[in-house]
């Protein structure tokens, strides 16, 4: 094992630069691998339903990168975001295009009128089924890909054993019921558990600081012994591995 002092300095360096622009994980590209073979294609599903005259809202758009990739007519496009650095980014990139962007961090109070949208999309963001029902036109669709409650749990246990699940109800069975009770018809519902692997501890440190809600209270100082154990595993096995949890819901009002 490398000198512990040097490792700690290296990991603290990763910790200090754990900031992202939009939702950009390029800093650890090649140093980790996340299962991309999800058995559905979120973008293709959206395009299946999207017509040029449809009014679409991307709630919790991040930096707007995915929304812009759809190339939907800007006059029929709206977006919200609540994370301050991303809000500023959206103001700089989306508003000049004519996209109806509004700052919003409360999924139960979205600042648009009743029945404003034909399609609402949301990837890995918050949502409130009753509020979505209010915002959608009759026959309108909500399409979401979500991170489930079991996401990265093995990795959390490696460094913060005993940490409670932050959102225990985020799974397909419970959320499908929530949407049905809110008056939606479920058109598609799928769930997937896929591997995530880290090839160096520094990449994991950066990741854990970015995904701070999954790793509450994590720091190199606090978890140093656990990180050393992770380092040993990587030296012996070439990686540390966990599991991602994703689910998809397409619901019609």
Each PLM stretch: what is its role?
Residues 1-27, 36:
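N-terminal, positively charged/glycine-rich alpha-helical extensions of SAM-dependent methyltransferases
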Residues 22-25, 33-55, 65-69:
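Conserved alpha-helix/loop element of class I SAM-dependent methyltransferases that forms part
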Residues 55-109:
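Class I SAM-dependent methyltransferase SAM/SAH-binding core
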Residues 109-119:
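A short acidic, Gly/Pro-enriched loop at the edge of an enzyme's catalytic core
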Residues 127-143:
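A short glycine-rich, Lys/Arg-flanked "PGG" loop and its adjoining helix->strand segment in the class I
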Residues 148-166:
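Short, glycine-/aromatic-enriched active-site segment of Class I SAM-dependent methyltransferases
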Residues 160-174, 215-217:
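Acceptor-substrate binding/catalytic loop of class I
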Residues 185-253:
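Conserved Class I S-adenosyl-L-methionine
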């Amino acid at each position: 094992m490398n000198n512990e002092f040097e490792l700690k300095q290296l990991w603290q360096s990763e910790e200090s630069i754990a900031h992202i622009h939009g939702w950009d994980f390029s800093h650890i590209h090649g140093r980790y691998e996340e299962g991309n073979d999800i058995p559905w294609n979120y973008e293709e599903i959206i395009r299946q339903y999207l017509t040029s005259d449809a009014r679409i809202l991307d709630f919790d758009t991040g930096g707007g990168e995915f929304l812009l990739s759809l190339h939907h007519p800007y006059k029929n496009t709206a977006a919200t975001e609540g994370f301050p650095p991303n809000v500023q980014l959206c103001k700089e990139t989306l508003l000049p295009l004519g996209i109806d962007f509004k700052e919003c961090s409360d999924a139960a109070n979205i600042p648009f009128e009743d029945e404003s949208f034909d399609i609402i999309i949301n990837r890995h963001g918050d949502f409130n089924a009753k509020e979505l029902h209010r915002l959608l036109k009759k026959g309108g669709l909500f399409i979401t890909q979500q991170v489930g409650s079991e996401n990265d749990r093995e990795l959390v246990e490696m460094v913060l054993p005993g940490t409670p699940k932050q959102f225990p109800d985020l799974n397909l069975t419970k959320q499908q019921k929530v949407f049905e009770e809110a008056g939606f018809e479920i058109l598609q519902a799928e769930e997937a558990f896929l591997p995530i692997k880290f090839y160096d501890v520094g990449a994991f440190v950066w990741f854990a600081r970015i995904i701070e809600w999954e790793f509450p209270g994590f720091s190199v100082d606090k978890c140093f012994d656990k990180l050393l154990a992770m380092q040993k595993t990587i030296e012996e096995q070439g990686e540390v591995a966990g599991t991602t949890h994703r689910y998809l819901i397409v619901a019609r009002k």
